[in-house]
UniProtKB/Swiss-Prot annotation:
Keyword Repeat tagged: yes
Protein name: DNA damage-binding protein CMR1
Renumbered ranges of WD repeats: 198-239, 254-294, 346-386, 403-442, 457-496, 498-534
InterPro entries linked: WD40/YVTN_repeat-like_dom_sf (IPR015943), WD40_repeat_CS (IPR019775), WD40_repeat_dom_sf (IPR036322), WD40_rpt (IPR001680), WD_repeat_DNA-damage-binding (IPR050853)
Keywords: DNA damage, DNA-binding, Repeat, WD repeat
Keyword DNA damage in record: yes
Coiled-coil residue spans: none
Region annotation (Disordered) ranges: 39-80
Gene Ontology biological process terms from the UniProt entry: DNA damage response; regulation of DNA damage checkpoint
Amino acid sequence: MVAELTEFQKKRLENIKRNNDLLKKLQLQGTANKIKREAGVDTVSRHEERLKKKKKIVNAKKQSEKEASPKTAMPTRRSRRLMGQQVKNEEGIPNVSDTQLLKMNRNKELEDLKDIKETAVIGDVKLSDLIKTEEGSNEDELLAKFKQFANKNFSSGDFFDIIKKRQKETENDSDLTKMQEDFDLHMYDVFQPNEIKITNERITSMFFHPSTDKKLIVGGDTSGTVGLWNVRDEPLAENGEDDLVEPDITKVKFFTKNVGKIECFPTDTSTLLITSYDGSIRTLGLKDLKSADIMTLRNSYEEPLGISDCQFSYDNSQVLFLTTLGGEFTQLDLRAKPTETKFWRLSDKKIGSMAINPQRPYEIATGSLDRTLRIWDVRKTVETPEWSQYEDYHSHEIVSTFDSRLSVSAVSYSPTDGTLVCNGYDDTIRLFDVNGELPEDLDEKNKTVLKHNCQSGRWTSILKARFKPDQNVFAIANMGRAIDIYNSSGQQLAHLTTATVPAVLGWHPLKNWIAGGNSSGKVFLFTDELNTSK
């Protein structure tokens, strides 16, 4: 039973009702809560507080259940790289990204090929072991191909007897017109020059075999590859039978750097001598197609010395004169077993060219990167040369010197009239009269100066003037895409145009034939024979 309200309680309820009605009329019902919010007083209701407390209790209970459940121990991940540890790869898979792994697989063959290219041929080898065709190597076929160049008719001094006879002839022919007619040469046309690629890279040396019945041109390039072109003189059939015939070219890689010089032995023209910038000296026999390793030129520290030029002595056909990329000079007797080599210093920088005076075989001329042309007497030794900054080797006596404005690229002697030609980066060709006693300043013996663009640049081999072995005529490539031929007086005899720059030249020693090699390994051949028709 509910107790009745007292008068005081009734009066209190009436006051509350009256106050609420008044607030409604004044629209101030939410003012108190608003004032609390502005004052920062918590206005959360007790109901809401109870809900929050209940939620906390439930979460705490769940957390305690999780901690009570058994947990599997997991290792903490750490970076071995940051810890400085080496990762052991037991499966042999490189620790690289997928993209890098694909690149590695793609370039593996190229890297293997590069390693092979950088590996030099050591010891005596057969060409058939180094040359592989689609059908494999065929030694009998290779021997048959070069058999005619191994004929004994071209050995035992016969070749040099012919040249000696030509050298003794007095050249009284002053008819310039006749000489120009003799060197009005025709370009070989059985194959086009862009088909005659005898090497893979830029040609650095050329050699024309002295055989007159059949032409053989040998070239070397910057990669150490030697190419032999067995020239076809017969025209191609017009009925289409020879449409698929290609130039007969054999390539073999002997060295790891530039092929510096290719020559044949004076007493046996069936054997070639080849030198390289990697210091190697090898022979190549055309009879058996075997290559013998003569030696690798090294200094006292067993470091290989790149061979820049070489020539057989006129006094002894078994002695080889050599110059190096470091400015050294030496003489090698090829009959003796390789022993410690004795060097003389002729320059503090690279010797780019060397030539022996045929009238005085004890005199040699050198053209160097130090901007000098010097003539030396190799019979006399100077212990401490004043001009050199080095004290490692003795030197020879200087006979005469010409100081050039820029480096001297080439030197070459005429066979009979005592003319020395040199050219260099000063865009000139200079002819000197070296007959008789020479003054200290070779410029006093200057015969003539020809303007010529000799600056070949990076992608073209250095242009070098070279005298023909049996005539007082020299040739030099032209940056205007031609071969220029002059006599020893500086009169121009021919201007043989080509499609590209035939930077490296090779004269035939007996015939008016000349070949030039360009920067892509291709050859331009000019002869005095009438062109054949395809």
